[in-house]
Amino acid sequence: MEKFFKLNEKGSNVKTELIAGLTTFLAMAYILGVNPAVLADAGMDKASVFLATAISAGVASIFQGLVANYPVALASGMGVNALFAYTICGQMGFSWAAALSAVFISGIIFILISVTGVRKAIINAIPVQLKLAIGAGIGFFIAFVGLKNAGIIVASPSTFVTIGNLTDPTVLLAIVGLLITIALVIKNVPAAVFVGMVITAVIGIILGFMGMAGMPTLPEHFISFDFELQAAGSCFSGISELFANPFQAFVVIFSFLFVDFFDTAGTLVAIGNRIGLINDKGELENAEQALLADAVGTVFGAVLGTSTVTSFVESSSGVGVGGRTGLTACTSGVCFLLAVFLSPLILSTVTNAVTAPALIVVGIMMAQQLKGIDWDDMIFAAAGFVTVIMMILMYSISNGIACGFIVYTIAMIAAGKAKEVHPTVWALMIIFVLYFATPYIM
């Protein structure tokens, strides 16, 4: 095992990788509850989506670990599932079967451009300082997600965002968990993020026994054997509906391609920066294999009946406790497969109050990449700042990346350095502009 995953070379060991994999899984476990709820709004069966989500995440994560040796787990992505349910099925009126067809086709296209090296070429064309901004931006983004999920911040019609209800016991639990986790990190406690999550969950369960509502609880039955994949294979039956209007079909498939491509790119770049997978030329090690795992996961997930499977930025939680190899991803994958049986226990104990502190602390760690940006150079300062701020304000990793690329290209033109812009970056800038112009085109 040590030779296969190169544990010694990566400065890790089996125990650390197992803990990291479990930590990543716990940080991602919310998707097992959220994804079925979101896709149910498109008319899909919750139980079926839960099963498809768990199995596809397990298989894709294990594939990632074995083929790419990356500590990055995969599952049905947030954001892209909302695109599936509320835009493709809601606003555009497609059935969920047709939407699954679009996911399946986008996955096939991903496999082709991953095998041919096109995806790697695009990622490697991103300027190094933009990669740092993307990594830091994702850190701010997941910290924002953690704060929102915990209820520490809430939406406000007057100020957009405001402080949450600090008298809510679940909000207080998340705050206590955050402070505990920060203290553990400062004290250099091994697996501090994971330990913080466990302590938070235990405190919540105890408070639940004392009668406080909304706390993590222990279920009556820890194991379930109620399985049914109602949507399996539906991606094939929806193809004719999808292509009834070829232009709309193109828009739908392109939307899935765009969101998954750059969410994945951002995640891999961010984690690659953290663990030294990016060389002096700014190239990502084993990029083809990691991107192929993402593409295969999407195809497999579509066949089972779930939205696009993508690399999860929450994998940085596992990296934060020492995960450095594919054994971390394999461990997370096994946990997802076991989750098929342990759904009652997982959904009742791993609440937002438990995962939020981990997301916030890891966000703090990832934000440190900002120090690598040359803030005296207005080109990178502007592009980096816009990348970070737009990820948060638009609540979208891919939109933040798109804005950063556009600003970077325009800034290079203004500085008289247009010839230094990589051809791939020019092409991406044009695609990003067209992406934002899609509502006007439609």
Predicted regions and their residues:
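Helix-loop-helix hairpins and the membrane-proximal interhelical loops
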Residues: 1-48, 162-163, 197-288, 433-434
